Amino acid sequence: MASSQGPAPSLRGVGGDEVLRLLSRLAVGKTPPADASVTTVPAPALLDGRRVRALVVGGTGWHVVAADVDPAWVAAQVAHDPIEAPLGARFLSALADRVGGEPGVLDALLVALPAPAAPGLELVETGPGEHPRVRRALAHRTDVRVWTTPDGTALLALGRGVCGRWETGVEVQPAVRGRGLGTALAAAAPALVPGGEPLWAQVAPANTASLRSFLAAGWRPVGAEVVVG
Protein backbone atom coordinates (compact mmCIF):
# COMPACT_ATOMS: atom_id res chain seq x y z
CA MET A 1 0.00 0.00 0.00
CA ALA A 2 1.33 3.41 -0.92
CA SER A 3 2.24 5.66 1.96
CA SER A 4 0.23 8.80 2.61
CA GLN A 5 1.67 12.30 2.37
CA GLY A 6 -0.47 13.34 5.32
CA PRO A 7 -4.08 13.14 6.50
CA ALA A 8 -6.70 12.74 3.80
CA PRO A 9 -8.28 16.06 2.79
CA SER A 10 -11.91 16.64 3.63
CA LEU A 11 -14.27 15.08 1.10
CA ARG A 12 -17.90 15.72 1.90
CA GLY A 13 -20.80 14.23 0.00
CA VAL A 14 -23.73 11.85 0.05
CA GLY A 15 -24.31 8.23 -0.80
CA GLY A 16 -21.72 5.52 -1.05
CA ASP A 17 -19.69 5.86 2.15
CA GLU A 18 -17.29 3.19 0.91
CA VAL A 19 -16.71 5.11 -2.31
CA LEU A 20 -16.09 8.32 -0.34
CA ARG A 21 -13.50 6.57 1.79
CA LEU A 22 -11.80 5.15 -1.28
CA LEU A 23 -11.65 8.56 -2.96
CA SER A 24 -10.29 10.25 0.16
CA ARG A 25 -7.48 7.73 0.38
CA LEU A 26 -6.69 7.85 -3.32
CA ALA A 27 -6.44 11.63 -3.11
CA VAL A 28 -3.36 11.35 -0.89
CA GLY A 29 -1.78 8.40 -2.68
CA LYS A 30 -3.04 5.70 -0.36
CA THR A 31 -4.12 2.91 -2.70
CA PRO A 32 -5.65 -0.51 -2.04
CA PRO A 33 -3.24 -3.44 -2.17
CA ALA A 34 -2.54 -4.98 -5.57
CA ASP A 35 -4.07 -8.31 -4.59
CA ALA A 36 -6.53 -8.81 -7.49
CA SER A 37 -9.41 -7.91 -5.18
CA VAL A 38 -12.81 -6.97 -6.61
CA THR A 39 -14.93 -5.35 -3.91
CA THR A 40 -18.66 -4.73 -4.32
CA VAL A 41 -20.22 -1.81 -2.42
CA PRO A 42 -23.57 0.04 -2.67
CA ALA A 43 -24.18 2.44 -5.55
CA PRO A 44 -23.35 6.09 -4.84
CA ALA A 45 -25.49 9.16 -5.46
CA LEU A 46 -25.32 12.82 -6.45
CA LEU A 47 -26.00 15.64 -3.99
CA ASP A 48 -29.50 16.19 -5.40
CA GLY A 49 -30.46 12.60 -4.63
CA ARG A 50 -30.12 11.21 -8.15
CA ARG A 51 -28.69 7.72 -7.99
CA VAL A 52 -25.77 6.60 -10.09
CA ARG A 53 -26.74 3.15 -11.30
CA ALA A 54 -23.19 1.89 -11.00
CA LEU A 55 -19.59 3.04 -10.79
CA VAL A 56 -16.55 0.86 -11.42
CA VAL A 57 -13.20 2.19 -10.24
CA GLY A 58 -9.94 0.33 -10.67
CA GLY A 59 -6.22 0.68 -10.19
CA THR A 60 -3.14 -1.52 -10.11
CA GLY A 61 -4.44 -4.95 -9.12
CA TRP A 62 -7.69 -3.80 -7.46
CA HIS A 63 -11.24 -2.81 -8.42
CA VAL A 64 -14.33 -1.51 -6.66
CA VAL A 65 -17.77 -2.12 -8.16
CA ALA A 66 -20.25 0.34 -6.64
CA ALA A 67 -23.66 -1.02 -7.57
CA ASP A 68 -26.75 -2.40 -5.87
CA VAL A 69 -26.10 -5.95 -7.04
CA ASP A 70 -25.26 -9.25 -5.36
CA PRO A 71 -21.50 -9.42 -4.67
CA ALA A 72 -21.61 -13.11 -5.53
CA TRP A 73 -22.87 -12.23 -9.01
CA VAL A 74 -19.98 -9.80 -9.50
CA ALA A 75 -17.48 -12.38 -8.27
CA ALA A 76 -18.80 -14.97 -10.71
CA GLN A 77 -18.68 -12.53 -13.62
CA VAL A 78 -15.02 -11.58 -13.11
CA ALA A 79 -13.62 -14.81 -11.66
CA HIS A 80 -11.87 -15.74 -14.92
CA ASP A 81 -9.74 -12.57 -14.87
CA PRO A 82 -10.14 -10.31 -11.82
CA ILE A 83 -7.30 -8.07 -12.99
CA GLU A 84 -8.77 -7.12 -16.37
CA ALA A 85 -12.44 -8.12 -16.40
CA PRO A 86 -14.00 -5.49 -14.07
CA LEU A 87 -13.27 -2.66 -16.53
CA GLY A 88 -13.67 -4.83 -19.61
CA ALA A 89 -16.49 -4.43 -22.11
CA ARG A 90 -18.14 -7.78 -21.36
CA PHE A 91 -18.53 -7.20 -17.63
CA LEU A 92 -19.53 -3.56 -18.01
CA SER A 93 -22.23 -4.55 -20.49
CA ALA A 94 -23.52 -7.26 -18.15
CA LEU A 95 -23.47 -4.84 -15.21
CA ALA A 96 -25.36 -2.21 -17.19
CA ASP A 97 -28.02 -4.77 -18.11
CA ARG A 98 -28.23 -5.85 -14.48
CA VAL A 99 -28.87 -2.33 -13.17
CA GLY A 100 -30.89 -1.07 -16.15
CA GLY A 101 -28.41 1.49 -17.40
CA GLU A 102 -25.90 2.26 -20.11
CA PRO A 103 -22.14 1.98 -19.59
CA GLY A 104 -20.23 5.22 -20.03
CA VAL A 105 -16.77 5.62 -21.45
CA LEU A 106 -13.62 4.40 -19.76
CA ASP A 107 -11.77 7.39 -18.32
CA ALA A 108 -8.46 7.87 -16.61
CA LEU A 109 -9.13 9.24 -13.12
CA LEU A 110 -6.88 12.09 -12.00
CA VAL A 111 -6.79 14.13 -8.80
CA ALA A 112 -5.36 17.44 -7.64
CA LEU A 113 -5.09 18.42 -4.00
CA PRO A 114 -6.45 21.76 -2.73
CA ALA A 115 -4.55 24.82 -3.92
CA PRO A 116 -4.33 27.73 -1.45
CA ALA A 117 -3.23 30.26 -4.06
CA ALA A 118 -5.49 32.11 -6.45
CA PRO A 119 -5.65 30.83 -10.03
CA GLY A 120 -2.63 31.92 -12.04
CA LEU A 121 -4.80 32.52 -15.11
CA GLU A 122 -7.27 35.34 -15.62
CA LEU A 123 -10.74 33.82 -15.66
CA VAL A 124 -14.22 35.31 -15.83
CA GLU A 125 -17.16 33.48 -14.24
CA THR A 126 -20.10 33.26 -16.60
CA GLY A 127 -23.48 31.61 -17.00
CA PRO A 128 -23.81 28.00 -18.13
CA GLY A 129 -24.64 28.81 -21.75
CA GLU A 130 -24.99 26.10 -24.37
CA HIS A 131 -21.47 24.74 -24.61
CA PRO A 132 -21.56 20.92 -25.01
CA ARG A 133 -19.13 20.42 -22.12
CA VAL A 134 -21.33 22.51 -19.84
CA ARG A 135 -24.50 20.71 -20.95
CA ARG A 136 -22.83 17.43 -20.09
CA ALA A 137 -21.75 18.79 -16.71
CA LEU A 138 -25.31 19.90 -15.93
CA ALA A 139 -26.58 16.42 -16.79
CA HIS A 140 -24.12 14.61 -14.53
CA ARG A 141 -23.20 17.09 -11.78
CA THR A 142 -24.70 19.55 -9.33
CA ASP A 143 -23.51 23.03 -8.28
CA VAL A 144 -22.05 23.61 -11.74
CA ARG A 145 -20.03 26.81 -12.23
CA VAL A 146 -18.35 27.99 -15.42
CA TRP A 147 -15.39 30.25 -16.15
CA THR A 148 -13.90 31.40 -19.44
CA THR A 149 -10.81 33.30 -20.42
CA PRO A 150 -11.59 36.99 -21.13
CA ASP A 151 -11.54 36.38 -24.88
CA GLY A 152 -13.84 33.35 -24.57
CA THR A 153 -11.43 30.96 -26.28
CA ALA A 154 -11.14 28.58 -23.32
CA LEU A 155 -13.59 27.25 -20.78
CA LEU A 156 -13.40 25.63 -17.35
CA ALA A 157 -16.41 23.92 -15.74
CA LEU A 158 -16.60 22.87 -12.11
CA GLY A 159 -19.30 20.81 -10.42
CA ARG A 160 -20.07 18.10 -7.90
CA GLY A 161 -20.38 14.59 -9.24
CA VAL A 162 -20.48 11.11 -7.71
CA CYS A 163 -20.73 11.25 -3.90
CA GLY A 164 -20.47 15.04 -4.08
CA ARG A 165 -16.84 15.04 -5.18
CA TRP A 166 -15.70 18.14 -7.03
CA GLU A 167 -14.97 17.47 -10.70
CA THR A 168 -13.69 19.65 -13.51
CA GLY A 169 -13.50 19.70 -17.28
CA VAL A 170 -11.71 22.13 -19.58
CA GLU A 171 -12.02 23.01 -23.25
CA VAL A 172 -9.76 25.06 -25.52
CA GLN A 173 -10.89 26.22 -28.94
CA PRO A 174 -8.89 24.67 -31.80
CA ALA A 175 -7.53 28.02 -33.00
CA VAL A 176 -5.61 28.60 -29.75
CA ARG A 177 -4.48 25.08 -28.96
CA GLY A 178 -0.79 24.28 -28.64
CA ARG A 179 -0.03 27.37 -26.54
CA GLY A 180 -0.21 25.82 -23.08
CA LEU A 181 -3.70 27.12 -22.33
CA GLY A 182 -5.05 23.68 -21.45
CA THR A 183 -2.27 23.20 -18.91
CA ALA A 184 -2.94 26.67 -17.48
CA LEU A 185 -6.64 25.83 -17.05
CA ALA A 186 -5.85 22.51 -15.37
CA ALA A 187 -3.42 24.28 -13.04
CA ALA A 188 -5.95 27.01 -12.19
CA ALA A 189 -8.90 24.72 -11.43
CA PRO A 190 -7.93 23.44 -7.93
CA ALA A 191 -7.84 26.99 -6.53
CA LEU A 192 -11.50 27.44 -7.50
CA VAL A 193 -12.75 24.58 -5.31
CA PRO A 194 -14.41 25.78 -2.09
CA GLY A 195 -13.80 24.14 1.26
CA GLY A 196 -10.32 22.76 0.66
CA GLU A 197 -11.51 19.59 -1.05
CA PRO A 198 -9.58 17.63 -3.68
CA LEU A 199 -10.56 18.07 -7.30
CA TRP A 200 -11.09 15.21 -9.75
CA ALA A 201 -10.95 14.94 -13.52
CA GLN A 202 -11.95 12.15 -15.86
CA VAL A 203 -9.95 12.13 -19.08
CA ALA A 204 -10.41 9.71 -21.98
CA PRO A 205 -7.06 7.93 -22.48
CA ALA A 206 -7.27 8.58 -26.23
CA ASN A 207 -7.46 12.33 -25.61
CA THR A 208 -3.70 12.53 -25.30
CA ALA A 209 -3.58 16.32 -25.58
CA SER A 210 -5.89 16.73 -22.57
CA LEU A 211 -4.08 14.03 -20.63
CA ARG A 212 -0.72 15.72 -21.23
CA SER A 213 -2.17 19.06 -20.09
CA PHE A 214 -3.40 17.68 -16.78
CA LEU A 215 -0.19 15.79 -16.11
CA ALA A 216 1.90 18.86 -16.92
CA ALA A 217 -0.21 20.84 -14.43
CA GLY A 218 0.71 18.42 -11.66
CA TRP A 219 -2.41 16.27 -11.58
CA ARG A 220 -1.86 12.70 -10.46
CA PRO A 221 -3.43 9.64 -12.15
CA VAL A 222 -4.91 7.31 -9.53
CA GLY A 223 -6.89 4.81 -11.59
CA ALA A 224 -9.62 4.44 -14.16
CA GLU A 225 -13.40 4.48 -13.91
CA VAL A 226 -16.63 3.92 -15.78
CA VAL A 227 -19.97 5.37 -14.71
CA VAL A 228 -23.11 3.44 -15.63
CA GLY A 229 -25.91 5.96 -16.02
Question: What are these language model-derived features?
Answer:
Residues 1-104, 124-141:
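N-terminal charged segments
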Residues 63-66, 164, 193-205:
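Conserved GNAT acetyl-CoA-binding A-motif
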Residues 101-108, 112-113:
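Short, compact, well-ordered microdomains
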Residues 115-122:
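Short, charged/polar, Gly/Pro-enriched secondary-structure boundary elements
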Residues 143-156:
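Conserved beta-hairpin
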Residues 153-165, 170-173:
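A conserved beta-strand-loop-helix scaffold within acyl/acetyltransferase catalytic domains
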Residues 168, 172, 178-192, 210-216:
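Conserved acetyl-CoA-binding loop-helix of GNAT-fold acetyltransferases
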Residues 201-211, 215, 220, 228-229:
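Conserved beta-strand-loop-alpha-helix junction that forms the acyl-donor binding cleft
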